[in-house]
Amino acid sequence: MFKEQETRMITVFGEGAVKVSPSTVHVVLSVVSRGTELGEIQQENARRMNQVIQSLQKAGVAEASIQTTDFQIRPVYDYVNGEQRFQGYEVINSIRMTSDELSRTGEFVDLAVKNGANQIGSIEFTMPNSDKHYQRALVLALQDAETKMITIGTSLKLQNRPIPLKIEEQHTSQPVAFRAVAMADTGKTPIESGTMTIRASLQVKYQIV
């Protein structure tokens, strides 16, 4: 009686990584104002934010590279002996600045703070062509899996080379390159873009024949 031969499988994981330098920086800058007279703090907040924007534009940041991302007006309360007491209002105005002059990031931050910004929301370095680098990492991951399979096959003294039957992409989070250090003796804020590592991971199932 014919008996179907059981399929023998080996699963290996391959990983690939590509290091690249980011090309764009995004900085979120905010002006936060507090007071009891809403009209006054709105005007003060607007004046300071306009000053921040104008200073960045004078430094070479294009108008199209500065975008308002958030504007809030909210009441501020304090709690004394379990009782809620009105303290005033808080106005928050945030912008997102984009630049390809990564070496000037610290300069832009210092300039914004000098002209009225009092909160730095985030500093993010990115690449416009990250998909291209990820494809390279995938190729390296597949090569890594193949190398591992050859090593396993040699160790097991397999007569035939295993056949890849299924390749599954494993999702991995991509880190954002950002490195900042404390204020230097020069009084400037040093911010370094560093490098970004694009990673890819694959699960490959091989059939042993």
What are these regions (language model features)?
Residues 1-115, 119-209:
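Short, charge-dense linear interaction motifs
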